């Protein structure tokens, strides 16, 4: 699902975190229109017009979370392309991340600023979780996978 996003931006899953975030933010902001928030009917039309791009952004964002924090998709890609209720599961320190629902809510309520805030919250929670596990002497998958 994220393949179009990667191609469109000259990226791949191994690209730098900041490059991926920059392109997600740039695309999200390019389809944002503050006027649509005042009119729910228009919001629905605007969503339908941009649904495919939002799903691609969601897939790229999910892949970034999996790479940087951990977790896995709950459903296969074919299923995810047709449903808004997909999610990441087993994300360390977080549990579930509802994508693309979360990304669509970020787009509706603050756009890229909201997405970046939530992403830094995930990163902080993951870092704090690793620190506390170390203090407690608990080895995590992040330790054994070299993510420290």
Q: What role is predicted for each listed range?
A:
Residues 35, 46, 60, 118-121:
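Intrinsically disordered, low-complexity N-terminal regions enriched in serine/proline/glycine
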Residues 4, 22-26, 30-34, 67, ...:
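Charged/polar, solvent-exposed surface patches and flexible loops
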Residues 28, 38-39, 53, 65, ...:
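Alpha-helical protein-protein interaction elements
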Residues 48-109:
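Amphipathic protein-protein interaction modules
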Residues 85-148:
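A recognition module on extended beta-rich or small alphabeta surfaces enriched in W/G with H and D/E
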Residues 1-53:
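N-terminal low-complexity, intrinsically disordered segments
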Residues 9, 68-69, 136:
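Residues at alpha-helix termini
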């Amino acid at each position: 699902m994220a393949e179009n996003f990667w191609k469109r931006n000259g990226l791949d899953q191994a690209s730098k975190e900041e490059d991926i975030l920059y392109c997600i933010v740039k695309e999200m902001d390019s389809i944002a229109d503050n006027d649509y928030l005042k009119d729910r009917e228009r919001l629905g039309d605007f969503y339908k017009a941009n649904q495919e791009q939002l799903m691609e952004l969601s897939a790229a964002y999910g892949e970034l979370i999996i790479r940087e924090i951990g977790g896995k998709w709950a459903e296969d890609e074919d299923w995810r392309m047709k449903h808004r209720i997909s999610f990441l599961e087993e994300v360390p320190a977080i549990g579930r991340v509802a994508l693309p629902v979360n990304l669509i809510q970020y787009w509706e309520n603050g756009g890229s600023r909201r997405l970046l805030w939530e992403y830094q919250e995930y990163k902080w929670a993951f870092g704090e979780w690793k620190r506390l596990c170390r203090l407690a002497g608990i080895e995590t998958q992040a330790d054994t996978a070299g993510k420290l």
